[in-house]
Regions:
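Glyoxalase I/VOC metalloenzyme domain signal
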Residues: 1-187
């Protein structure tokens, strides 16, 4: 990758005021980042723009937490994402891969062949790229009922964890947990 460039971008808050957002950018050739263009780093003015609580939804999902990324070389990808996010603290996830803790949530980076054991399920297939996302629900039974009522084909992994596969054309999955402890890399 090219050197990082710190920039300020402007956005408008709900009151119509111009707010500066600090951004860290770099140019990448597609060959430099084959697994994904992950844009889940950090958005500083989030607190300003969402000064009121995010409205609740009927599905009871309340927060995006993690992005699950697969790579042929998780060690190299972890080093790159750690550098890009300016986060030096990484943690080994057993033999599955690595976790980079962000200001909100994590990047979980693993080998594609480790995906089936990542959530102890056979839901995810071998791939390179963004394999899934994790979100939190404040009421798993209500979330499951919402999915069922809307004819969404979800999987109940256990009483605290659901999975909602994306269409095959997109691939991947959203994992919905009651809290962060249900995801294997949170420990």
């Amino acid at each position: 990758p090219m050197p990082l460039s710190d920039q300020k971008l402007s956005t408008i808050d709900p009151n119509g005021n111009l707010v500066d957002a600090e951004a860290r950018l770099c140019r990448l050739r597609k060959s430099d980042m084959t697994e994904a263009y992950a844009e889940f780093i950090y958005h500083e003015p989030e607190k300003l723009i969402w000064s009121n609580p995010i409205p609740s939804h009927n599905n009871r999902i309340m927060a995006l937490r993690d992005v699950i990324i697969t790579s042929k070389n998780p060690d190299e990808a972890t080093a790159r994402y750690s550098w890009f996010a300016n986060k030096g603290s990484i943690k080994k996830i057993d033999e599955l891969g690595w976790k980079i803790q962000l200001d909100r949530g994590n990047l979980a980076i693993c080998k594609s062949e480790a995906l089936s054991s990542l959530i102890r399920s056979k839901i995810l297939t071998e791939t390179d790229g963004i394999a899934g996302y994790t979100v939190l629900s404040n009421d798993i039974p209500t979330t499951a009922k919402f999915f069922s009522d809307n004819n969404l084909d979800f999987i109940q992994i256990n009483e605290d964890l659901l999975a909602l596969p994306f269409p095959k054309s997109i691939g991947g999955c959203v994992f919905i947990g009651k809290d962060e402890s249900v995801f294997p890399w949170s420990g």
